[in-house]
Amino acid sequence: MKFYALIPAAGSGSRMGGAIEKQYMDVNSVPMIAHAMMVLAREPRIARIFVVLSPTDKRWNNYEWQGWEERIEVLRCGGGTRAETVLNALDAIAEVCDPADWVLVHDAARPCLPDEMLGKLLDEVADDPVGGLLAVPVADTLKRAAGDTSSGTRVEATVPRAGLWQAQTPQMFRHGTLTEALRAAGSDMTDEASAIEKLGLQPQLVESDSRNLKVTYPQDLELASLILGKMNA
């Protein structure tokens, strides 16, 4: 049994509103995706890391990746959605990956994954029959917006937060099971665990923390920079 990692990086990050794709934006003078790659590369149990790019990506080759060759392989098979990108990558690595091998899917836009959280995920899920993901219990009070209002966005109801968790990545599932799940679920799945759930399976939740944030909006870049600065101090 081996562990492999996938970093889907074929999207544009439209909510960031930047001039370049989100995964290539600088965080502490390093492309965001490189931070995600580095933490995975530091984990010796991960046999190989596959970075999944759009076939039309023109920025990857603008950077110096010398020294990464033994750990990183680039796949230019990204699709129109995250689910399509991950499924295309799973198909591309099927010849080297046994159906029982573990695949960890990690967001390129999560540059602050702590080493110990990655290790915790591997330790707790390696013997699980389904797989699992990093996640954090929801702490804030949640409000559901009313669907039809003429006077601005209004609260329709408060959503009980008991039992609610915020999904993070990596999300870790066996190659065969994840391939089956994504093929059956279609292209609108926003994370891998959702596809696994549609098979009737229950992924394990492995508690993480707020350092492992996803950079989604411009203000998140400053926070990610501060977190990385403290982690690397």
Swiss-Prot record:
UniProt-recorded Gene Ontology molecular function terms: 2-C-methyl-D-erythritol 4-phosphate cytidylyltransferase activity
Top-level lineage group: Bacteria
One GO BP annotation of this record: isopentenyl diphosphate biosynthetic process, methylerythritol 4-phosphate pathway
Entry-linked InterPro entries: IspD, IspD/TarI, IspD/TarI_cytidylyltransf_bact, ISPD_synthase_CS, Nucleotide-diphossugar_trans
Site (Transition state stabilizer): R15, K22
Keyword field: Isoprene biosynthesis, Nucleotidyltransferase, Transferase
Catalytic activity: 2-C-methyl-D-erythritol 4-phosphate + CTP + H(+) = 4-CDP-2-C-methyl-D-erythritol + diphosphate
Its EC number(s): 2.7.7.60
Pathway(s) annotated for this protein in UniProt: Isoprenoid biosynthesis; isopentenyl diphosphate biosynthesis via DXP pathway; isopentenyl diphosphate from 1-deoxy-D-xylulose 5-phosphate: step 2/6
Keyword Transferase annotated: yes
Chain positions of site Positions MEP for the nucleophilic attack: R161, K214
HAMAP family: IspD
Family: Belongs to the IspD/TarI cytidylyltransferase family. IspD subfamily.
Role of this protein: Catalyzes the formation of 4-diphosphocytidyl-2-C-methyl-D-erythritol from CTP and 2-C-methyl-D-erythritol 4-phosphate (MEP).
PANTHER family: 2-C-METHYL-D-ERYTHRITOL 4-PHOSPHATE CYTIDYLYLTRANSFERASE, CHLOROPLASTIC (PTHR32125:SF4)
Protein name: 2-C-methyl-D-erythritol 4-phosphate cytidylyltransferase
Source organism phylogeny: Bacteria, Pseudomonadati, Pseudomonadota, Betaproteobacteria, Nitrosomonadales
